[in-house]
Amino acid sequence: MKPSLFLTALCLGIASAAPKLDQNLDADWYKWKATHGRLYGMNEEGWRRAVWEKNMKMIELHNQEYSQGKHGFSMAMNAFGDMTNEEFRQVMNGFQNQKHKKGKVFHESLVLEVPKSVDWREKGYVTAVKNQGQCGSCWAFSATGALEGQMFRKTGKLVSLSEQNLVDCSRPQGNQGCNGGLMDNAFQYVKDNGGLDTEESYPYLGRETNSCTYKPECSAANDTGFVDIPQREKALMKAVATVGPISVAIDAGHSSFQFYKSGIYYDPDCSSKDLDHGVLVVGYGFEGTDSNSSKFWIVKNSWGPEWGWNGYVKMAKDQNNHCGISTAASYPTV
């Protein structure tokens, strides 16, 4: 995100007329601020409160409709409550939607049958949910997640890998640190570099350091390249079932996703082409007794465990590539 964009949005808010606030929400506002450690200047407090109230009322309306069966998922107030949707998209979503296919191609014809449900968390392939903070580094978290899974598949050891290593060091491959990147570029960096450090040795800072401090002796992963999956959900399903967790990009720019809490996420406005957020598919499944209905992808996000379904989201599966989940899927080869 460019700081000037944030400042512009902020200044526009401050310059507007003083908003009329709902005093009935005072206690909720003070509790939310305390929970998330928010401190504002005198001029900013009213504007942020107004944004928060607008988001709160939108969430309440959605959940009323959810209780009436009009939606398949619920929403909840969270750490993004004082952000406009425009700010949210600028700060949190850092996938660069300009994929240049350079990897091998996944051959789905070699896979005949797959299970009706898969969850690689149950097999030890997936680390705990992480938090990218206010840095557009989603691509790095998606990439480490896929590489962590493949290294576990190869070695039987699950080691948390360093997103900061990717943020600091993969600019020559085309990534832009906190201003966005591509998972395939990250996989290419690991191959070119000959390794990727552990999270423990190269901890995440949530900002750019303008200095690459990779230490070969602390490397815990390597790859030989990457595989791009054909842009079909059936191909993605076969890859998830047979390979492990898969890096994908989605359209995550909607308020409904910003405040997602539980259930199967489906928003008719979600695009299959305008992708802005890198995440990790760790499995798939279905709700109820009919495996042909209420199907979902199990998606690991990088906004902390308090967001959504303990840091995850169930995304509608086999609904015309909803939110573009199969548009830019890939995984590293190790």
Swiss-Prot record:
Any matching Pfam family: Inhibitor_I29
Keyword Oxidoreductase on entry: no
Binding positions for Zn(2+) 5 per the UniProt entry: 251, 254
UniProt-annotated binding residues for Zn(2+) 2: 163, 199
Membrane topology: Peripheral membrane protein
Mitochondrion as UniProt keyword: no
Propeptide: 18-117, 290-291
Keywords, alphabetical: Cell membrane, Cytoplasmic vesicle, Disulfide bond, Glycoprotein, Hydrolase, Lysosome, Membrane, Metal-binding, Protease, Secreted, Signal, Thiol protease, Zinc, Zymogen
InterPro entries assigned to the protein according to its UniProt record, in alphabetical order: Papain-like_cys_pep_sf, Pept_asp_AS, Pept_cys_AS, Pept_his_AS, Peptidase_C1A, Peptidase_C1A_C, Peptidase_C1A_papain-like, Prot_inhib_I29
Residue numbers marked as site, Cleavage: 106-108, 112-114
Compartment(s): Lysosome; Apical cell membrane; Cytoplasmic vesicle, Secretory vesicle, Chromaffin granule; Secreted, Extracellular space
EC nos: 3.4.22.15
Catalysed reactions, as listed in the record: Specificity close to that of papain. As compared to cathepsin B, cathepsin L exhibits higher activity toward protein substrates, but has little activity on Z-Arg-Arg-NHMec, and no peptidyl-dipeptidase activity
Record protein name field: Procathepsin L
